[in-house]
């Protein structure tokens, strides 16, 4: 947020890669095949942890196929159907990102889509990982775990929500009260 200019964005990606020990998705902005290839190769060259994030459109699927052939890992994003997820996997995507919250926003079941994709990949033996995106709350995280999503991108508030439980709070309060009674 607040990072302007391509060079500053790319420096920011490298900074993130130096902090986290895992994959970092970096999104292409181009929507044409040639532009996606150019941007994706530049992004992939920044750091081995970079995964090139490509939109799930016809040109994006072609780009995923190209990147897969070059050993460049990809995240096919803006996935809203099992058909899109199938094409991404067939093209060799490393990750596919179904958008849970955005589907829920239009009265479709985002978690059901994640479950359908997980089941389809297992049935057909695809190695593409399901990266649940557009997670809005703690229940989404737990539901994604229950249906077998491999990864989820989550807001910090939802992650913190995993710690919250009223019995933990009341139990801790009781422990501390008991401790004070015994130890003054």
Which residues make up each language-model segment?
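Active-site beta-loop-alpha junctions enriched in small/polar residues
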Residues: 27-31, 55-59, 79-81, 100-101, ...
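Alpha-helix-loop-beta-strand connector modules within alpha/beta enzyme cores
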Residues: 9-24, 61-74, 110-130, 173-184
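C-terminal alpha-helical cap/extension of soluble enzyme domains
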Residues: 121-184
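A contiguous pocket-lining binding segment that forms or flanks enzyme active sites
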Residues: 77-131
